[in-house]
């Protein structure tokens, strides 16, 4: 297979409309745009959300909420993800090294999702009640 020989499957693409090729084609003269008006002109049309001069919906409704900057640097870690970490100690740096969390993450919380197969030591991470019970049941421990 070569890139220059690739083509779409037969019948997968519709032929483009050939506009302005005589009245017999059905798309001659006005080319499917009707007569006059803003939408018939080249470059004609209105922007998204424009309601003809009436105050548009997105401006009639109040602003609300914000994006928490802390949420951008916080991540959840599942119990099943702990198996991807080499070694017995799990902290922020070992999670980043194992590609479990992104490089920009500064806070992480271990949640109860999946199972933990081996005893691990959690260091410097927040842990939910259920995850704490599962880690301790597997013989692991949590260090603050």
UniProtKB/Swiss-Prot annotation:
Gene3D superfamilies: 3.100.10.10. Keywords: Ribonucleoprotein, Ribosomal protein, RNA-binding, rRNA-binding. One of its GO terms (biological process) is translation. Residues 21-31 have a biased composition (Gly residues). GO terms for cellular component: cytosolic large ribosomal subunit. Residues 1-53 are annotated as: Disordered. This is Large ribosomal subunit protein uL15. The keyword Flavoprotein does not apply. Belongs to the universal ribosomal protein uL15 family. The gene is rplO. Binds to the 23S rRNA. InterPro entries: Ribosomal_uL15, Ribosomal_uL15/eL18, Ribosomal_uL15/eL18_sf, Ribosomal_uL15_bac-type, Ribosomal_uL15_CS. One of its GO terms (molecular function) is structural constituent of ribosome. Part of the 50S ribosomal subunit.
């Amino acid at each position: 297979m070569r890139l220059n020989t690739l083509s779409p499957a037969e019948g997968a693409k519709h032929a483009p409309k050939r506009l302005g090729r005589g009245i017999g084609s059905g798309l001659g003269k006005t080319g499917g745009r009707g007569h006059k008006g803003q939408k018939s002109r080249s470059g004609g049309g209105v922007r998204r959300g424009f309601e003809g001069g009436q105050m548009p919906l997105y401006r009639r409704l109040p602003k609300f909420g914000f994006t928490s900057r802390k949420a951008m640097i916080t991540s959840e870690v599942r119990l099943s993800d702990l198996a991807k970490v080499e070694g017995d100690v799990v902290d922020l740096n070992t999670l980043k090294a194992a590609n479990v969390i992104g490089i920009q993450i500064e806070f992480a919380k271990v949640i109860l999702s999946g199972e933990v197969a081996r005893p691990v030591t959690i260091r410097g991470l927040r842990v939910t009640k259920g995850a704490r019970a599962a880690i301790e049941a597997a013989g692991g421990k949590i260090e603050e």
